[in-house]
């Protein structure tokens, strides 16, 4: 992260400008929003129609899948149709496994995306093959030989390129030497850019995607560091691959992309959500709105104040002693007086995920609640105390911003919690706070509040600001104050943020691709059905992937996979291994359940 001495905040990483069609990306230009079509690319009219819808939604770059020469030729007609309609949105071709398609389509599109894991080398098939130093060196020579024609053609035509590394599809050669590590991802990217540099071609953008936000953030940080150390200031395209469906997908994207944006990294972004591609753009817009604030703060810092506050979120550097709630990362929800006056205890318990009859808690039931002080001692609160920890909102001080005097005050050092109001430069000042306090023997628990009314905006903002700290281990609990959002949704936002940051697993996790022209079934519908069947299997990771091109690789972190193999057929995976092939679609979901039973991870829903 680059810290501006005058503002103590992130500054946007310097990147050179890359021309993509009629626009430029780089630090001198606005951060661009992009998406990808889900129509078969060979269906020119359907693809053009979907791109027009993306343009209407304010998408700035459109990508299409190009799996062969037929699709490459279709791109010529797609581009012609768009231009005839006065639509000049840059068109990007997505290439996997087939360099000839890249060479052909470069004539028609504005940018070519290649995956270093499968452009020249074979995708890792976990065969255990060993590469000697000579084998490895020979492979690099072959890479340069095969990759050079595309680089030379793009340079000659003035076309851009994205070197798009995916954590789940590193080549066999890289995996054998480095494993599926951050180092392996960075090496995979650098091998290709070294060829570009040798040929004097710099119209290149990088991406370092993973379905795991923790891996994704670490990979981008490391690549940016390594590129800058070489004096190579290439732009970055940000994305959490196969983020998923609905609020879970939005939150996972926001944790990864939002964290990096607040650090000044990123020149283009995409939120890979399962469903209609136009739904991705509002999420991108919201992310840019919430994170740009961190890069555009006034030079005069906000006045410091230490006051009482009504809500808090604990963000301590590390757990140094047992927390009152017993969980490493607790979840607390602020209840308004309206919640307490207008609902029965039974209704409140249901909304908080607790069975009022037997007291059984849902996996996403909070650890406690924050209530107005005037309600302490009432019969309602006493009944809620039987199931939850209860705090009132005057028990801890509130830190609206940080300076040395406040950091070292007895009021902060001795408080059980310290509220920190989550307004920019909240993320950066919080990190600085912990850097100064981590050597102090007395644990300081810093907590922060967020008060938002809109469900969608709340999810993006909380996932970005809380997630950015949680990813780096700065946090012990989250407490949300969302009076106009339903309590079940507040719980979902809180626990999805913790799960996406990898600090508390309370739900089944789904890795589902957004779909593209290769998709072989209705992804949103099937993903929703599988979620309903398996959502009670806490801690399990299930991938739902539209095709076998990216599916087996992109579901690297999953325990089980449901992958389209051909039209109307599904393959089922355990980790990286296909264990059941070509299952008719109508039987596949039940076969997945049977597979889970065979591996002893299935249990009937309660």
Swiss-Prot record:
The main enzyme category here is: oxidoreductase
Q: Which reaction does it catalyse?
A: (2E)-4-hydroxy-3-methylbut-2-enyl diphosphate + oxidized [flavodoxin] + H2O + 2 H(+) = 2-C-methyl-D-erythritol 2,4-cyclic diphosphate + reduced [flavodoxin]
Single GO biological process annotation from the record: isopentenyl diphosphate biosynthetic process, methylerythritol 4-phosphate pathway
Which molecular-function annotation in GO is an example for this chain? Answer: 4 iron, 4 sulfur cluster binding
Q: Which cofactor does it need?
A: [4Fe-4S] cluster
A Pfam entry, by short name: GcpE
Report if keyword 4Fe-4S is assigned: yes
Q: Which parts of the sequence bind [4Fe-4S] cluster?
A: 513, 516, 547, 554
- So where does this one cross the membrane? none
What is the UniProt remark on how the cofactor binds and its stoichiometry?
Answer: Binds 1 [4Fe-4S] cluster.
InterPro entries named in the record: Dihydropteroate_synth-like_sf (IPR011005), IspG_atypical (IPR017178), IspG_bac-typ (IPR004588), NO2/SO3_Rdtase_4Fe4S_sf (IPR045854)
Q: What is its EC number?
A: 1.17.7.3
Q: Which UniProt keywords apply?
A: 4Fe-4S, Iron, Iron-sulfur, Isoprene biosynthesis, Metal-binding, Oxidoreductase
Could you tell me the superkingdom of the organism this chain comes from? Bacteria
Q: Pathway of this protein?
A: Isoprenoid biosynthesis; isopentenyl diphosphate biosynthesis via DXP pathway; isopentenyl diphosphate from 1-deoxy-D-xylulose 5-phosphate: step 5/6
Briefly, what is this protein's role?
Converts 2C-methyl-D-erythritol 2,4-cyclodiphosphate (ME-2,4cPP) into 1-hydroxy-2-methyl-2-(E)-butenyl 4-diphosphate.
* Similarity comment: family membership: Belongs to the IspG family.
Q: Which NCBIfam families match?
A: ispG_gcpE, PRK00694.1
The name of this protein is 4-hydroxy-3-methylbut-2-en-1-yl diphosphate synthase (flavodoxin)
Q: What is the lineage of its organism?
A: Bacteria, Pseudomonadati, Chlamydiota, Chlamydiia, Chlamydiales
């Amino acid at each position: 992260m680059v810290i501006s001495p005058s503002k103590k905040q992130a500054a946007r990483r310097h990147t050179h400008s890359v021309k993509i069609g009629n626009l430029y990306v780089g630090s001198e230009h606005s951060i661009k929003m992009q998406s990808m079509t889900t129509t078969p690319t060979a269906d020119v009219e359907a693809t053009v129609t979907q791109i027009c819808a993306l343009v209407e939604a304010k998408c700035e770059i459109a990508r299409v899948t190009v799996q062969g020469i037929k699709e490459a030729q279709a791109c010529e007609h797609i581009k012609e149709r768009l231009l005839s309609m006065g639509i000049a949105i840059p068109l990007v071709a997505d290439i996997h496994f087939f360099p000839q398609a890249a060479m052909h389509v470069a004539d028609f599109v504005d940018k070519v995306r290649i995956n270093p894991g499968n452009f020249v080398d074979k995708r890792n098939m976990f065969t255990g093959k060993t590469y000697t130093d000579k084998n490895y060196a020979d492979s690099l020579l072959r890479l340069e030989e095969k990759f050079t024609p595309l680089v030379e053609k793009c340079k000659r035509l003035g076309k851009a390129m994205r070197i798009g590394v995916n954590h789940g599809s590193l080549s066999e050669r890289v995996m054998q030497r480095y494993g599926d590590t951050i180092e392996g991802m960075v090496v995979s990217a650098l091998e290709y850019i070294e060829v570009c540099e040798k040929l004097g071609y710099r119209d290149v953008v990088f991406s370092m995607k993973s379905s795991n936000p923790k891996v994704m953030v670490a990979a981008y940080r490391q690549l940016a560091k390594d590129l800058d150390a070489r004096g190579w200031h290439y732009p970055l395209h940000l994305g959490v691959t196969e983020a998923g469906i609905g609020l879970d997908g939005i939150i996972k994207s926001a944790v990864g992309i939002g964290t990096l944006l607040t650090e000044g990294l990123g020149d283009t972004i995409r939120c890979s959500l399962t469903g209609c591609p136009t739904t991705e753009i509002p999420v991108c817009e919201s992310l840019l709105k919430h994170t740009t604030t961190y890069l555009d703060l006034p030079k005069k810092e906000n006045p410091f104040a230490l006051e009482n506050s009504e809500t808090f979120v604990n963000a301590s550097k590390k757990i140094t002693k047992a927390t009152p709630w017993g969980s490493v990362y607790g979840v607390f929800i602020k209840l308004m007086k309206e919640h307490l006056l207008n609902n029965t205890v039974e209704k409140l318990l249901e909304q908080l995920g607790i069975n009022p009859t037997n007291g059984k808690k849902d996996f996403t039931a909070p650890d406690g609640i924050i209530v107005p002080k005037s309600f302490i001692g009432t019969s309602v609160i006493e009944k809620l105390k039987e199931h939850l920890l209860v705090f009132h909102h005057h028990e801890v001080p509130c830190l609206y911003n940080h300076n040395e005097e406040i950091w070292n005050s007895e009021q902060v050092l001795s408080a059980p919690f310290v509220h920190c109001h989550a307004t920019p430069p909240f993320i950066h000042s919080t990190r600085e706070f912990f850097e100064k306090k981590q050597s102090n023997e007395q644990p300081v628990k810093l907590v922060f509040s967020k008060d938002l009314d809109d469900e969608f905006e709340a999810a993006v903002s909380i996932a970005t600001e809380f997630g950015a700290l949680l990813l780096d281990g700065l946090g012990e609990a989250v407490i949300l104050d969302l009076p106009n959002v339903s309590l079940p949704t507040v719980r979902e936002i809180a626990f999805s943020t913790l799960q996406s940051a990898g600090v508390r697993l309370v739900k089944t996790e789904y890795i589902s691709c957004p779909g593209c022209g290769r998709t072989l079934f209705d992804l949103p519908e099937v993903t929703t059905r599988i979620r309903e069947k398996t959502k009670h299997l806490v801690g399990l990771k299930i991938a739902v992937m539209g095709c076998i091109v990216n599916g087996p690789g992109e579901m690297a972190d999953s325990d089980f996979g449901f992958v389209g193999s051909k039209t109307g057929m599904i393959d089922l995976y355990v980790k990286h291994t296909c264990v059941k092939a070509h299952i008719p679609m109508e039987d596949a979901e039940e076969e997945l359940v049977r597979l889970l039973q065979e591996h002893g991870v299935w249990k009937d829903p309660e």
